């Protein structure tokens, strides 16, 4: 047998083939003949086995194995109960409480713990340096000191050290106990001391724990004062919108509610001036106002545009620029102008959209159009846009600007109007600068009068009204971009190709 995992070597070849009892069924002559030789071979085998085992396991185990081999067990090792080899190997897997067989050296190296030893910490039971838990006996001293100092329950550093020595507690435990006691008295409305700030005469004499509590008291007092001020002046502050409270969340709420308050009016006026300069081609457009108009018109993409009404006026000078077809928008020249009071009834949330889509005024009229009739410029009250219409129109123009004419050239109008129509290339010379973005362009009265179209048959009324409405939206809602002249040239070329075909 072989046990390589335990270190036992295969020792069967050490014994000769002739052994007593190996041929049990043989005759007596054979047993008598091999008796002496067998005994000598057993001695030799036992001696050689003892030599091998002594080199592997040591003298005690080699002697036991040799004795077992001398008794005729052959290569089988004696697994006797008195042999302590397996308890020796399995001692490390036994429990500490079990009285297992242990090696004397291991027993000397790892003695059992002494009963007086405290095994779960660095302190023994009788160690005076071990921190003591707060008991009634120890806290009675602290309670007595607190009752004597109810008007000033803040012990100094020296008093804390003295109390810690008397009660056998640490400074941290003493400070924590006093902090909890003051907090408990405060909750029970038994405060007999005046709350002090950190800037008093004795502020530097107190510890950090005292300063933290004073800071908490100051914060609570400040919060109470703020709550009282909010209850008294809350309505006035919301109306003005210019004064902020100490709380950041309340400031944000005020800013969200007062989108068109006094704080935003200067920005809107500056943005309006910049937009007028952009219409005249004098400066770049304002990205912030465009983003405001886009934000105010979000969520209205699927809504149809309501009906817009224009007051009756002389034929306008501005040429109807090529624009998107908008069947839902209609124009009624005979409808009266809405009352100016409707602007006051609009919600506050649409104030930015109203500012972005306000109708043009005499200050925004181009200086180059000198030949236009005096009534050509529409008054601000002549074109009143509802909030939804203004926001939706602004969003619609953003989604499909004039620079994307080739994207919808496969959707032409149903048919040309029966009336006379000039070539679209005349736009380059007759359109005002705020439509084409050309700073030096001048208006031609003849071409403008030809494009006025005072009367048309019913077949072209819808399309003419759509062009007029889009023209007004172009004048009021958006400003020119740097590449706008090239876009107009492309649009004019596309429309000329469509009309020629």
UniProtKB/Swiss-Prot annotation:
Name used for this protein in its record: Iroquois-class homeodomain protein IRX-3
SUPFAM superfamilies, alphabetized: Homeodomain-like (SSF46689)
Subcellular location: Nucleus
Primary location class: nucleus
Biological process annotations from GO: atrioventricular bundle cell differentiation; cell development; energy homeostasis; His-Purkinje system cell differentiation; mesoderm development; metanephros development; negative regulation of neuron differentiation; negative regulation of transcription by RNA polymerase II
GO MF term list: DNA-binding transcription activator activity, RNA polymerase II-specific; DNA-binding transcription factor activity, RNA polymerase II-specific; DNA-binding transcription repressor activity, RNA polymerase II-specific; RNA polymerase II cis-regulatory region sequence-specific DNA binding; sequence-specific double-stranded DNA binding
Keyword Transmembrane helix: no
PANTHER family membership: IROQUOIS-CLASS HOMEODOMAIN PROTEIN IRX, IROQUOIS-CLASS HOMEODOMAIN PROTEIN IRX-3
PROSITE patterns referenced in this protein's UniProt entry, alphabetically: HOMEOBOX_1, HOMEOBOX_2
Encoding gene, per UniProt annotation: IRX3
Family: Belongs to the TALE/IRO homeobox family.
Organism name: Homo sapiens (Human)
SMART domains: HOX, IRO
Region (Disordered): 190-381
Composition skew (Acidic residues), residue ranges: 210-220, 227-258
Reported function: Transcription factor involved in SHH-dependent neural patterning. Together with NKX2-2 and NKX6-1 acts to restrict the generation of motor neurons to the appropriate region of the neural tube. Belongs to the class I proteins of neuronal progenitor factors, which are repressed by SHH signals. Involved in the transcriptional repression of MNX1 in non-motor neuron cells. Acts as a regulator of energy metabolism.
Record feature DNA-binding region, as residue ranges: 125-188
Alphabetical UniProt keywords: Developmental protein, DNA-binding, Homeobox, Nucleus, Phosphoprotein, Repressor, Transcription, Transcription regulation
Cellular component terms (Gene Ontology): axon; chromatin; cytoplasm; nucleus
């Amino acid at each position: 047998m072989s046990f390589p995992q335990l270190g036992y070597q295969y020792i069967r070849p050490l014994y000769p083939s002739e052994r007593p009892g190996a041929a049990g069924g043989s005759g007596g002559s054979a047993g008598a003949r091999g008796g002496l030789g067998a005994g000598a071979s057993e001695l030799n085998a036992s001696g050689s086995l003892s030599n091998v085992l002594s080199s592997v396991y040591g003298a005690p185990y080699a002697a036991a194995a040799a004795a077992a081999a001398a008794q005729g067990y052959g290569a089988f090792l004696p697994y006797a109960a008195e042999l302590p080899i397996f308890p020796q190997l399995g001692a490390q897997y036994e429990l500490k409480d079990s009285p297992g067989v242990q090696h004397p050296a291991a027993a000397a190296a790892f003695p059992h713990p002494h009963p007086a030893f405290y095994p779960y910490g660095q302190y023994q039971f009788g160690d005076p340096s071990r921190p003591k838990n707060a008991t009634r006996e120890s806290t009675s001293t602290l309670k007595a000191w607190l009752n004597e100092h109810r008007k000033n329950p803040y012990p100094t550093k020296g008093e804390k050290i003295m109390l810690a020595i008397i009660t056998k507690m640490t400074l941290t435990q003493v400070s924590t106990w006093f902090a909890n006691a003051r907090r408990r008295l405060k909750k029970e409305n038994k405060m007999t001391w005046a709350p002090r700030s950190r800037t008093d005469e004795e502020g530097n004499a107190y510890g950090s724990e005292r300063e933290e509590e004073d800071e908490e008291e100051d914060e609570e007092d400040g919060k109470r004062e703020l709550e009282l001020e909010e209850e008294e002046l809350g309505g006035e502050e919301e109306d003005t919108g210019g004064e902020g409270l100490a709380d950041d969340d309340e400031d944000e709420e005020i800013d969200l509610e007062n989108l068109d308050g006094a704080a935003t009016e200067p920005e809107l006026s500056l943005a309006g001036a910049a937009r007028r300069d952009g219409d005249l081609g004098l400066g770049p457009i304002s990205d912030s106002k465009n983003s405001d108009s886009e934000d105010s018109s979000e969520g209205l993409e699927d809504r149809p545009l309501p009906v817009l009404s224009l007051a009756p006026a002389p034929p306008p000078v501005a040429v109807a620029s090529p624009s998107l077809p908008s069947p839902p928008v209609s124009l009624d020249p005979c409808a009266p102008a809405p009352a100016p009071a409707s602007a006051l009834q609009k919600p506050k949330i649409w104030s930015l959209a109203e500012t972005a889509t306000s109708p043009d005024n005499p200050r925004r009229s181009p200086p180059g159009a000198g030949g236009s009739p005096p009534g050509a410029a529409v008054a601000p009250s002549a074109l009143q846009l509802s909030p939804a219409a203004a926001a939706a129109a602004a969003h619609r123009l953003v989604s499909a600007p004039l620079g994307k004419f080739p994207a919808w050239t496969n959707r032409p109008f149903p048919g040309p109007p029966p009336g006379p129509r000039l070539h679209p290339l005349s736009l380059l010379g007759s359109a005002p600068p705020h439509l084409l973005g050309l700073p030096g362009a001048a208006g031609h009265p003849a071409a403008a009068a030809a494009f006025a179209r005072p009367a048309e048959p019913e077949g072209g009324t819808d399309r003419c009204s759509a062009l007029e409405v889009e023209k007004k939206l172009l004048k009021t809602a958006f400003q020119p971009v740097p590449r706008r002249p090239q876009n107009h040239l492309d649009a004019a070329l596309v429309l000329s190709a469509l009309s020629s075909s």
